[in-house]
Curated annotation (Swiss-Prot):
Oligomerizes as a hexamer. This is Cytolytic protein enterolobin. One of its GO terms (biological process) is killing of cells of another organism. Cytolytic protein with insecticidal activity. Acts as a pro-inflammatory agent.
């Protein structure tokens, strides 16, 4: 439908497609349509268009009214609407809600970023040939319990756990099991490394039999933790990682390459911060945090009936893509849920050949949900990789993926970008110069000329000597930064 539908009054269940500059023009009026084909238009969505952090009245007071239609975003009236000028603060049709159409899959350049399907992801990682696309394991959806991983000699094997074994009051999952439960040639072991989960009551799911590829272990166990009323610790889940004495990788044993250590604080979903993660680190066993022990237990408090995901993965995952995939698209849509000034901090160095320190860190520690799609340019050497890191996911800083120099980066949502470089570069409000070439900000899918989208400089790099080499730019929603290297 056309934009003038709003002028004439919305028809129940009708989708109104409008311009990109306001999501209110993309609305649906209906009793329950929001829950099926649309997303609710609330204060968090409005925040990506205009600062409405004090949205305690109808939205015409904040410049968001559209053709006599106003939306209430305060608690208790979320997504309600009424006509402008009505005397009551109650919605004129309280059974209706205002929504906006669910966005389509993000597009980076002309390459469509496919929707994430766990089954497809697992199949690609574990069953395809060496030359096939390898996607990073999704590490950034704020797992409730924490992380464990195994790594050795910068090499990797991908293998998902077999069906969990219920043993008394424990659930045991064995890593890297080959045919008939025997290890293949890559792992010379009799007693395999095992994760033991002391459960309350679990309903387990599994991704089926594992498939071994090259040299990394990755597996996931998913279950529900229910309160066990027969014990005093009725809301406690015990997660314990054990390591067999004779567990070996090739010719190297845990005594000289594999260690067991605790990881950093993890933000538990319903509680305060608790240190619940465990790391099997590649370092001398006797130098790890828990030297001389093979078991580490943590006791996070688990609310009644909560889903528990236990992931095992490498600390560093390397992704190689086909030659025609060269864009990077970072989708931050799920970050902007609780309001607030979400900021991201990007650091860049002129010396990628000697320093792996291209970091992407969360500037605001309150951000907990983040999704990532990464595509890299092939045929680059390791000396040209930069590293992307995300802060406050499971570790203070977690290296997610090593990738070659990027071509384009897209952000969905308002954010602050800071580029740091050396030298007295001349920077205009329209084109952002950088040592490796240039960065043009443009609106997607319709670029606004060669100078890109005009952006407001929150902090000019030439404003003072202390900030001479730093540029901070506020970017409106749905812009793409094209980088040519």
């Amino acid at each position: 439908t056309q934009r003038d539908t709003l002028t004439k009054g919305m028809t129940q269940g009708q989708i109104v497609a409008g311009p990109d500059d306001t999501k209110i023009d993309q609305s649906i009026m209906d009793q329950g349509v929001c829950a099926t084909i649309a997303l609710p238009f609330d204060i968090h969505v409005a925040q990506s268009v205009k600062n409405v952090m004090f949205m305690f009245a109808w939205t015409q007071k904040h410049g968001l009214a559209v053709n006599n239609l106003v939306i209430l975003g305060v608690p208790g009236y979320l997504n309600m609407w009424k006509r402008f000028g009505e005397s009551t603060d109650e919605p004129s049709e309280s059974s209706k809600r205002c929504c906006y159409e669910k966005p389509t899959d993000p597009v980076s350049g002309e390459i469509v970023t496919p929707a994430f399907d766990p089954a497809d992801e697992i199949s690609e990682i574990t069953h395809q040939e060496e030359s096939a696309d390898i996607k990073p394991v999704r590490l950034l959806d704020a797992r409730l319990l924490g992380y464990t991983w195994v790594t050795q000699n910068h090499s990797w094997i991908v293998a998902y756990s077999d069906e969990p074994i219920k043993d008394g009051n424990e659930v045991v999952t064995l890593r890297n099991i080959g045919n008939n439960n025997f290890c293949d040639a890559l792992r010379k072991c009799t007693d395999k490394s095992a994760c033991i989960h002391q459960y309350l009551q679990f309903a387990w799911n599994s991704f089926g039999d594992p498939t071994v590829r090259t040299r990394q272990v990755v597996f996931e166990v998913v279950g529900w933790a229910d309160s066990d009323t027969t014990n005093n610790n009725s809301d406690t889940l015990f997660y314990r990682t054990t390591q067999a004495d004779n567990w070996q990788v090739l010719t190297e044993s845990k005594t000289n390459t594999i260690g067991l250590a605790e990881v950093d604080w993890f933000n538990f979903k319903y509680e305060t911060k608790q240190e619940v993660s465990i790391e099997i680190a590649r370092q001398t066993w006797t130098s790890t945090l828990n030297a001389g022990v093979s078991t580490v237990s943590r006791v996070p408090k688990v609310p009644i009936k909560v889903k528990i995901n236990v992931d095992t993965f490498l600390k560093v995952l390397f992704a190689v893509y086909k030659a025609d995939l060269y864009d990077i698209f970072l989708q931050f849509a799920s970050v902007f849920k609780k309001g607030g000034n979400r900021q991201y901090w990007l650091n860049y160095t002129q010396e990628p050949n000697t320093k792996s320190n291209y970091n992407h860190k969360i500037y605001n520690d309150k951000i907990r949900y983040l999704q990532e799609d990464v595509q890299v340019h092939p045929n680059e050497t390791q000396s040209k990789w930069w590293w992307w890191s995300f802060k406050k996911v499971a570790l203070t800083t977690m290296t997610v993926v090593a990738l070659t120099r990027f071509k384009a980066s897209g952000i969905n949502g308002q954010y602050i970008s800071a580029r740091q470089f050396s030298g007295g570069e001349t920077v205009s409000p329209y084109r952002l110069a950088a040592p490796f070439d240039s960065c043009l900000w443009r609106r997607s899918p319709n670029p606004l000329g060669t100078d890109g989208l005009k952006v407001a400089l929150a902090h000019h790099p030439l404003a003072g000597a202390s900030n001479r080499n730093k540029l901070r730019v506020s970017i409106p929603a749905q812009c793409i930064c094209s980088i040519t290297a």
